[in-house]
Amino acid sequence: MICTHDTSIYYAARLAGTSLIHRLDRDAHFRPFFDLRIRDGVMRASHASWDCVDMSGRFTDAWILLRQMMDWPVTEEESGVREYLLAGQSTEDGLFYDCGVRIADCGLGEHPSPQPSPSRGEGVDRADMFCQSRALLGLTSWFLESGDIEIEERIEMLADGLWEIAAKKDDFCYYLGHRYSPDGWTGVSAYTAKEMGPTALPAYGVLQILPLTRYWEATRSPAAERLILGLLNFLVRESGIIREDGGFNGHLHSWGILPSTVGVLRYAMATGRDELIPWCRRVYDFIVSRSSSFGWVPDGIGVDDGITTGETCCITDLIHLGVKLAECGHDECLDFVEVMARNQLPESQIRDTSRFEFESPEVETMTLGAYDSWVMPNGLTGCSELGLEGCCTASAVRAAYLAWKHAISHSSGEVRVNLMLSRRSEWLDTASYQPFEGRFDIVVRKPVRIAVRIPKWIAKPSVTMDGQPISPRVAGGWLRIEDARPGSRIELRFPIPERRTEEEIGGRTYRLSWRGITLMKIEPPGEIYPIFQRNLESMAELNAVPLDTLKTHPSVEW
C-alpha cells in the first residue's frame, strides 16, 4: 500500500503560479495573455481586453496568496504585472481602463492619463465594471500584504470614482451600463436590466462589494462602505436577481452573482447583519443542488439552454462562500467544500501537455499548470473554440489558498480542524493520507483544546494519542480532545469505502468509481483531455510539496 500524506493541492497551486509567470508578454510590458485557445488543432496564445485590468489584478492577487502558503518570491514578472496594473488607473477619475494607455505610450512605472492610444488598435478606453472588481481584488491583497500607503490611496481613489459615476436612488446605487468612458456608458443600466431578465446582467458590477468589504474590514474606509451599502441594497432588495428560495438564472461568476453573494456574506458577518446570512445560505444550497456529487459546478444555471461546462472561477467563489458560511455556524457546508478541493479543483488543471499541439514552446510552458474555463464533467477544453482563460488559473490559486487558510481555525482557546487536508499551523500540524488510506494525523505544537470536524461519510474513527487508544467526545459532527500536549501525535483511523455510482449531469449519465469522497474514475472519459482517470500511483506523484515547506499562518487574510 502507498503511504504518503496528500499535499497535491499545493503542488497544483505552485504549478498554476508558475504557469502565470510564463503567461506574460515581455514585449508588451508584462501584459498577460487572456486566451490559450485551440485553433485549427493548435493551442495558441492571444490578447484580449480582459488582459489589462482583470488579468493583471487577478495575477497580482494569485501570487500574493501563493506566498501565504509557501515560499514564493516577488519575481521580476510579478513586479512587472503590478506596474502594468497601476498604469491603467486614471489620475483624473480613479477608474481602471482596459484600452489604450500602456503598451506603446508608457514604460514601467509611468502612470499615463486615460487618453486613447491609436497605436493599440483596440478602440476607445473603457472602464469595465466587472474588471474594477478584479483590480480591487489585486490591490486589496497587495495592501493587506504590504500596508503600502500608495496602494491604499489608489483603492480610495477608485472607490470615490465608482461612487461618482454610480446612479443613486434612496439607499441604493447601481451603474448605468457595463462599461464606462468619459463619453458615456455602453451596455444596459442595472436598474433597467432588472426588468429585462438575467441576460441583461444586473449584477455585473455588484461583485465589487467582495474586495471592497475585505478592504473595509481592514480600514473602515467611509468611501468603501458607502459604495458597499449602495450596491448591496440594490442586489438584495431591488435587483430581483435572487429569488426567495435562493435560486436564480444566470452565469455564476461572469455575471457577478456568486462573488457578489460572498461579498454580502462578508459584510453581514462584519457588521452583525445576521438577517442576510440565511439569504446567502439559500444561494449556496441552490448552487450545490445543481452541481455534481464530485464538485463539478456549472458555469450557469437556467440560461443558454442548459450549461454543460463549468468554470474554475465558480469553484473558487463557492469555496469562499462555503468556508465563510461555516464561520457563521453552518459547518455542514464544509462537506462540499472538501469535495471540491479534493476532486474538481485539482482535476481542472492541465498537467499533461503531450495531448496538444502548440504554436510555440513558449505557449506550451504557459499551458502547463493552466486551468480550464470550459470543464466538462469528464474532460477539459469542453468548448474547443474557447479554452484556458487566464482568470481561471489565477482563481485556482485563490481556491487553494481559501481551502488552506480555512482548514484550521482558532477561537477562544480552541483549535478547529475544519477540513481533512494537510496543513501546518502555529498550534498544530495535520497530515491527510486520503485517498491512499483512511488516516489523519495531528501533531500538537501548543497546549490547546482541539476539535476535529468528522465528515458525514466517515463513521466514528478510532483514535490514538502517542500510540495509546483514547475515547474522545464526539458530538454534533466534532471530535474533541481536551488534554493534548505539545509534541503529542494524534492519529485518526477510518475505513475508506470503495463504491460505484451513476449520476446524470447535463442530460448525460456518467459512471463513477470512488475511494471515500475521492472520485477515482469517470466513464465514459472525455475526448480531448480526459479527467478523473486516477490511480493511487499517479496521485502519489503529485505530492511533491513537502509538508514542512508550507507556512504556518498567513499575513493576508481572506
Predicted regions and their residues:
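Surface-exposed beta-strand/loop patches in extracellular or lumenal glycoproteins
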Residues: 443-456
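Solvent-exposed beta-strand/loop surfaces of large extracellular or lumenal domains
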Residues: 458-483, 500-505
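Carbohydrate-binding/catalytic loop surfaces
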Residues: 29-50, 96-111, 123-131, 174-207, ...
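Catalytic-core region of carbohydrate-active enzymes that cleave or remodel glycosidic bonds
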Residues: 269-289, 305-353
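Low-complexity, Ser/Thr/Pro/Gly-enriched N-terminal "stalk/linker" regions
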Residues: 1-58, 65, 69-102, 107-109, ...
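Structural helix-adjacent loops and short alpha-helical linkers that scaffold large soluble proteins
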Residues: 1-10, 66-82, 142-159, 215-229, ...
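Well-ordered alpha-helical segments within folded domains of soluble proteins
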Residues: 49-68, 78, 126-144, 197-217, ...
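C-terminal beta-rich recognition modules with glycine/proline-rich loops and embedded aromatic residues
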Residues: 17, 280, 334-438, 474, ...
